[in-house]
Regions:
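A structural feature that tracks compact, well-ordered secondary-structure segments
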Residues: 227-231
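Nucleotide/phosphate-binding catalytic cleft detector across ATP-hydrolyzing
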Residues: 1-217, 235-251, 292-339, 347-380
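An amphipathic alpha-helix signature
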Residues: 252-259
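A mobile "lid/hinge" subdomain adjacent to the ATP/sugar-phosphate binding pocket shared
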Residues: 260-312
Length: 380
């Protein structure tokens, strides 16, 4: 402690004497703690007719857009990813829906289910995430209380104009998972046109490459739909206009044309199951000389159906009128010098990517990185 000493002397002057001042005895002050900033997690969800894709807490996931609905009387396994209850009804989505029996099956592409079952696809995304709900169960500890979660949602959908129906799905997100009750409070949401995340990634690519493009285009091949969207590359963010979609022209239809071609002629008594042909398509390749390869396992042997796959792709692009006209439109656009970016799970398949790129025949065509997930990660 600092002191000052004052005392009398014989000559009338004063000498220092020890005293304490208030400032010396006051306790040290500390700066007030800043309140912790609470970050509300954001679920980016792309509810496709074939697969539902999501991005949450830096993890990308997807599951087949299929759900199995169970009555109150039917018991469900506990702790399985993608298995949950909403009200008195049980649900299983994706692989869990395919592995369980009983109940009623609903698929994303049927009966307007992308919107009608939007609450199921949202909860299904949370319940298939490998850690999101489990971390909150651990933090909540033991007990029967409702675990409340604030959440932001970004939804990519061709049905983004149906705002009231979408808001209805957000209004009551209460469910049970792993024997715990959850309640989701959607604090905010944004609706984006399908393919918008890919458009953001395309705009970034143009900027990084020093391009001055006023317009660019995104060609999105998903499980159920082929979509072409032109974008304006001005005023900060990409702006879509005149979106053209061919419903029923996605990878599922390509697989169907492949199956039709594979079954022609003498198959040697082999039966090509749709799921095996789908696997052969997904693992297909194209050599530098342009030879297609699509191997399918038949018992102890393997057969290459590459020539049948190429024939199937040709039939798909020729016999579906919407596909034929859309691809012709894109070829005309390329002649004007405007870039076209390929995205969607279909362009993850090498044979499909090679076929369409070769058909379009232009150096202005580029495939975005990770085309199966860029549409959601591009929004982050």
């Amino acid at each position: 402690m600092k002191t000052q000493t004052i005392q009398n002397t014989t000559n009338g002057n004063t000498a220092p004497a020890t005293i304490a001042t208030a400032s010396d005895t006051a306790p040290p002050t500390t700066a007030p703690k800043k309140p912790k900033t609470v970050t509300v997690p954001e679920l980016i969800i792309d509810g496709g007719s074939s697969r539902t894709k999501y991005y949450l807490e830096k993890i990308t996931g997807s599951y087949q857009s299929i759900c199995r609905k169970f009555t109150k009387a039917q018991e469900l396994p506990t702790g399985y990813l993608g298995v949950f209850k909403i009200g008195d009804s049980g649900y299983a989505v994706g692989d869990s829906a395919l592995s369980l029996s009983g109940g009623d099956i609903e698929e994303g592409y049927a009966n307007d289910n992308k919107i009608k079952l939007l609450n199921v696809w949202i909860v299904g995304s949370l319940c298939t995430h490998p850690s999101f709900l489990f971390k909150r169960i651990k933090k909540a500890g033991k007990g029967n209380g409702v675990i409340k979660i604030d959440l932001k949602i970004a939804l990519l959908s061709l049905s983004s104009h149906r705002k009231k129906e979408i808001e209805k799905a957000f209004s009551n997100l209460k469910f049970e998972f792993d024997e715990r009750l959850f309640e989701i409070n959607v604090v905010s949401y944004n609706l984006y046109p399908e393919g918008y995340g890919a458009a953001c990634a395309a705009k970034k690519h143009i900027k990084e490459s020093g391009g001055k493009d006023i317009r660019f285009h995104v060609l999105d091949l998903g499980g159920g739909t082929l979509t072409h969207t032109p974008y304006s590359n001005q005023n900060g963010v990409p702006r879509a206009s005149n979106q053209n979609s061919v419903s029923g022209a996605g990878v599922v239809s390509i697989t169907e044309f492949f199956a039709k071609e594979a079954s022609k002629g003498d198959t040697g008594g082999n039966i090509y199951h749709f799921s095996r042909l789908k696997d052969a398509l997904e693992s297909s390749s194209v050599s530098e000389s342009g030879e297609y390869s699509a191997e399918i396992v038949l018992g102890d042997s393997t057969r290459d159906l590459g020539d049948r796959l190429k024939s199937g792709l040709e039939a798909w692009s020729r016999e579906i009128i919407g596909v034929r006209e859309l691809l012709r439109d894109v070829r005309q656009i390329l002649r004007k010098g405007e870039r076209v970016y390929l995205t969607g799970g279909g362009f993850k398949v090498e044979a499909v990517r090679a076929f369409i790129t070769n058909y379009l025949g232009s150096e202005l065509v580029a495939t975005l990185p990770n085309p199966d997930t860029i549409n959601i990660t591009g929004l982050d």
